[in-house]
Amino acid sequence: MSPPVAPPGWSRWLVPPAALSVHLSIGQAYAWSVFKPPLESALDLSGTQSALPFQLGIVMLGLSAAFGGTLVERRGPRWAMTVALICFSSGFLLSALGAATGQYWLIVFGYGFVGGIGLGIGYISPVSTLIKWFPDRPGMATGIAIMGFGGGALIASPWSAQMLDSFGTDNTGIAYAFLVHGLTYAVFMLLGVVLVRVPRTARPGAGGPAVATGPQVSARSAVRTPQFWLLWIVLTMNVTAGIGILEKAAPMITDFFADTSTPVSATAAAGFVALLSAANMAGRIGWSTTSDLIGRKNIYRVYLGAGALMYALIWLLGDSSKPLFVLCALVILSFYGGGFATVPAYLKDLFGTYEVGAIHGRLLTAWSTAGVLGPLIVNRVADHQEEAGRHGPFLYGLSLVIMIGLLVVGFVANELVRPVHPRHHVPGPGTPKEAADDRREQPESA
């Protein structure tokens, strides 16, 4: 499939809608918690078991983004979006078959493994292209697209709940819901495949963008720098703290207020998931755009520092007030989404646009790690507390304390980030070989 090069006069503002059509679709992953209670009931699963498809999906997202990042740079966004469409939709179809036959392993394989590959390739497919179209506003550009991933659950959560109400929450009803998801998202993602274009001067394999200013670092060199691994820690900590709540959102708010005079219904819990998705989406465009004004390091100070404060409030006072619980959770998820949307621009600031898509793909292995850690911490702690006879907010107290600690670790890592040493830079066309050799011989500094 040849790269879709933009014709003369093509408006760059037509590219974000193409990215949104893909990201809004694959963002359904954030609505997985709506399927957890029906699956647990229909297939007799624990909370930890019902999280497996989501966890594996996030693992595969990071791995496929890491190993496929360079290929996406070479083949272009249309090829990547096509692969994402096939894998993501096929994952739902396999899951439908697994639900209909009562074979949970097929749901884990379909949604988690096959669909997870679609998540990873689809997630990174427009990022490098958008940065090349909008070199003047990288935070805003990536925020527009990546907010679709956060907003996907805003659509999918109530839609999935409505389908389960209509089809039923037994094996057959869940299978029909998965089937409709797979077919619908295939059509919607096809819009992105048709619409996406790359700049004429930034074709994959054409040597990068038309104008590349500042340091330019290859993907191979980037992973050898302390800056890459510090950002990896920052992203891992921020994502772990957010994804644990997001994956457990519906049962968590139900448990927190189960013993009150106004317990939370299943419909209200699904609405809470939708609100979190709205905050996730708003944070991606709002905070990433703000980062263009105040800088990436400063915005991550907000994500990590204020995020720890929000978790502390939920831990100490969350069960005393629904508005406080919801408000703190919304702020946390806005930081979570903003962290994702801002990191491509942070990478661009540190490593340039030369292979920023491939570098971004490698960094998303942090998401894979967090996708296991976050749900594992929250679900495992909740399961153990339940076995000990505890209930309500006591199921989550230890998890909240752990999340606070993780955010503090991320805050420290962000403070240690410094500009990349010149010895890692790709020599420009006018750089003498001797100067490039001298740069490589200089000692590393943080």
Where do the model's predicted regions map?
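C-terminal transmembrane helical hairpin of 12-TM major facilitator-type secondary transporters
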Residues: 235-244, 267-343
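Intracellular juxtamembrane helix-capping segments at the cytosolic ends
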Residues: 39, 120-134, 141-142, 338-351
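Central cavity-lining transmembrane alpha-helices of secondary-active solute carriers
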Residues: 55-70, 274-286
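Glycine-rich segments within core transmembrane alpha-helices of 12-TM secondary carriers
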Residues: 137-158, 361-375
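Extracytoplasmic gate region of multi-pass secondary transporters
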Residues: 32-37, 157, 220-288, 374-379
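C-terminal ends and interior cores of transmembrane alpha-helices
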Residues: 86-100, 306-319
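Flexible cytoplasmic inter-helical loops of multi-pass small-molecule transporters
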Residues: 198-216, 423-433
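Symmetry-related core transmembrane helices of the 12-TM Major Facilitator Superfamily/SLC fold
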Residues: 175-195, 397-416
